[in-house]
Regions:
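Sec-dependent signal peptide hydrophobic core
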Residues: 12-23
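Compositionally biased, low-structure terminal segments
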Residues: 12, 29-30, 69, 251
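C-terminal segment of classical bacterial N-terminal signal peptides
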Residues: 24-35
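N-terminal secretory signal peptides that target proteins for export/translocation
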Residues: 1-13
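A subset of signal/propeptide-processing and intrinsically disordered low-complexity segments
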Residues: 4-5, 34-36
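N-terminal pro-sequences and low-complexity stem/linker regions of secreted or lumenal proteins
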Residues: 36-708
């Protein structure tokens, strides 16, 4: 990648671009269209509330406690977080109830069966394993973003004063070494003196070695890993925590198996703690880090929470990572491996595919004999064959890829322990797994390219075999189309992706930059959307179209919005302040159009928790989830100012809000939007008594009276 150098010419060019952007912004926020479309034919059905426009903005990979650990609500409101629980103090140090979040190790070396809640050799960590470095060492050298011109030409989705943060925040560390920016982490043995629980990433005592603007490492966030990290067993259940999930194995799972094993043997020099010459999962205790709002972290997020409404009981809908959670946001359900007509098929299992192999796309989280939790087959898929990365004996080009499970069959690896646990609950929870269906639990590319052509059958050498066939399952898009309710999916850098289907320009700097997230756009998986030229072209758009539609006051009823990889807030590859800048640009634009603002609700969330620790209650809804809590803020003139909802909810609650507001049917007979709204008992608003149940988010609003 060619890097730009600072020079007088670069400076003048940057000034020109900045001036042009300022002029564009003045035009953008100047006199706008005087009215947004009301509840007329443009939006089909009339709405039950003054909300005529829903905008759903989805960032990446942060739990509620990770961001809101020390948040303090306004008088009369309460919040459940690390501070309120006494787990940490206001300064981020361990609090009087720190033991609630302490982490344990286990030793299951004699087991060859997936352990959902291991008890063998379970022991409190004396200190946490050292969290390891993640993210660019130097932003200019590693990301190629060296000047404001580089930033502005590569990404158009930030409020102007946030572009500076695309140039900053490098870790200054090289490789997967102890992250010495964190207080309590050392560059020599002993590498960690961190207590065995949550720790503050940022610090304000002495040298500010980890400012909020820094890149941070990313923990493991896969399906079976998260189930294990939650440590769920009915024997742990209490009235306040009837699921019996202790969330005390986050560290142990990430240092014993991590992610992307892909069927490889455990290295002979493997270690669960960092040491020179040893091989680790590359994470350490990364999952336990959090930010401190009381010391100025996440300032725009705090501002929105203070001014509008949020939930402290909103969850990622499944255990695991981005693709699976995003799929639930659109389908309210998991999708399975099928043929073009929707008939369930078996994924490749220890066999060659067009790209080589053998691959094994069926998940097997059973530990390899003689190891302590090193799994048999689990990963996004491996690639080999270069001089620096030769293939193992008997392998050609690709291998691994365990990400599908037939969760209807208790004999399949990993399935039995979860089914047994779900059946033990009161009431027992149904799996919602259909016989012979292999569900996708982790990230695979969708089955279509942006032009609607088939990505699953494409054999171009730049393509990946770790792609799920297109699905005929129904999504919220079908429901909206059937009811003449307008919608668009706005995806940052979609236009660049259309001319770069294999994303060879991913990470490129400048106008060709293509950091579109294909696994984040649920409609991208769906046959009836992607293969219909009229529907696809009308409804799948770039965020440049979003800004234009806001300016014209011509926003659809429902908008799904996804930032690019530059600014989505994903740990290691992005930063939370960049996601804040992305959200701010949209919020400011909508508020600048008074009529549009008066009829809009903006839901700001993340796709999932990214594997970070969270202390909140997790309600089992089916085999797939729920997972940890994640942030949700509702920005609207109708939002209850400073209110914090405790009603149990997840991504499908957004679908329930849309369906209730526009009086729509549910997606299918098995989709999670059929679940009832929760009922609770006094004194425990977080736990539904009619489980499984999720809310519809209406309690975040006050529609009778509002003012700005």
């Amino acid at each position: 990648m060619k890097l730009r150098k600072n020079s007088a010419g670069d400076f003048l060019q940057t000034v020109r671009v900045m001036l042009a952007l300022v002029a564009l912004t003045q035009s953008f926020f100047g006199p706008l269209a005087q009215s947004a479309h009301a509840d007329d034919d443009h939006h089909g059905k009339r709405t039950r509330t003054p909300i005529k426009h829903v905008i759903v903005i989805v960032g990446e990979n942060r739990t509620f406690d990770h961001i809101f650990a020390t948040y303090k609500p306004k008088a009369g409101e309460s919040v459940n977080n690390l501070l309120s629980e006494g787990i940490v103090n206001e300064d981020g140090a361990p609090g009087p109830n720190y033991s609630k979040a302490q982490q344990y190790s286990a030793d299951i070396t004699g087991s060859t069966t997936y352990e959902l809640s291991p008890t063998s050799g379970k022991a409190l960590y004396p200190v946490l394993p050292a969290p390891l470095n993640g993210g660019p060492t130097n932003v200019c050298t590693d990301n190629g973003i060296c000047t404001l011109h580089d930033a502005i030409s590569s990404e158009n989705g930030l409020a102007l004063n946030y572009y500076q943060y695309m140039l900053t925040g490098g870790t200054g560390l090289t490789g997967k070494v102890p992250d010495t920016r964190i207080s309590g982490v050392n560059g020599s043995s002993p590498y960690s003196s961190l207590m065995p629980g949550p720790f503050q990433l940022t610090n304000s005592k002495g040298a500010d070695t980890f400012p909020y603007d820094s890149y941070a490492a990313s923990p493991v966030h896969r399906f079976y890993q998260m189930w294990q990290q939650e440590d769920c067993d009915i024997s742990h259940a209490t009235a306040e925590n009837p699921s019996g999930c202790l969330a005390d194995l986050f560290t142990w799972t990430e240092v014993t198996v991590g992610s992307n094993v892909n069927g490889a043997a455990q290295p002979p020099n493997f270690s669960t703690d960092y040491a020179p010459g040893k091989k680790t999962t590359g994470e350490g205790a990364t999952a336990m880090g959090f930010y401190n709002m009381l010391q100025g972290d996440a300032p725009y997020t705090k501002q929105l929470a203070d001014r509008y409404a949020m939930s402290d009981n909103y969850h990622q809908p499944v255990m695991g990572g981005t693709g699976f959670d995003e799929i639930f946001l659109y389908f309210g359900d998991a999708i399975w491996f099928s043929d073009e007509n929707g008939n369930a098929l078996t994924p490749p299992h220890n066999q060659n595919v067009w790209a080589g192999g053998p691959v094994d796309e069926i998940e097997d989280p059973n530990p390899v004999a003689g190891t302590n939790n090193w799994w048999t087959q689990d990963g996004y898929g491996g690639f080999c064959g270069s001089i620096t990365n030769p293939c193992p004996t008997g392998v050609s080009n690709v291998y691994g890829g365990g990400s599908y499970t037939d969760c209807s069959d208790s004999s399949h690896p990993g399935v039995g322990p979860i089914l047994t646990y779900l059946a033990s609950l009161n009431p027992p929870i149904k799996s919602n797994c259909e016989q012979g269906h292999y569900y996708l639990f982790n990230n695979y590319n969708p089955g279509y390219f942006g032009d609607g052509s088939d990505a699953f059958t494409d054999t171009n050498s730049n393509n990946t075999p770790f792609t799920i066939p297109g699905t005929t399952q129904r999504s919220i898009g079908d429901v909206l189309l059937e009811n003449n309710v307008s919608w668009k999916s706005y995806n940052d850098q979609w236009n660049a992706y259309l001319t770069d289907p294999y994303q060879l320009n991913y990470g490129a700097v400048g106008p060709t930059s293509d950091q579109y997230c294909n696994i984040c756009n649920g409609f991208h998986y769906q046959k009836q959307i992607m293969t219909n030229d009229g529907i696809r072209k009308a409804h799948l758009k770039d965020t440049t179209d979003l800004y234009a539609d806001i300016k014209k006051g011509d926003l659809p009823a429902v908008s799904f919005v996804k930032p690019s990889g530059w600014v989505d807030g994903h740990p290691a590859s992005s930063k939370w302040n960049l996601y804040e800048g992305f959200v701010k640009k949209i919020v400011d634009a909508v508020k600048a159009n008074e009529d549009l603002w008066e009829s809009t609700a903006i839901f700001v969330t993340t796709d999932e928790g990214g594997g970070y620790y969270d202390s909140g209650y997790v309600q089992p809804l089916d085999f797939f989830g729920d997972g940890t809590r994640i942030p949700l803020i509702v920005v609207s003139p109708y939002a209850k100012k400073g209110h914090i909802s405790h009603t149990y909810a997840d991504h499908v609650s957004i679908l329930k809000f849309i369906e209730r507001n526009w009086d729509l049917n549910t997606i299918s007979g098995r989709s999670r939007d059929n679940l009832p709204n929760p009922t609770t008992v006094q004194g425990n608003p977080y736990v539904p008594t009619n489980s499984p149940a999720i809310g519809d988010l209406f309690d975040l609003f006050q529609f009778k009276e509002h003012d700005e």
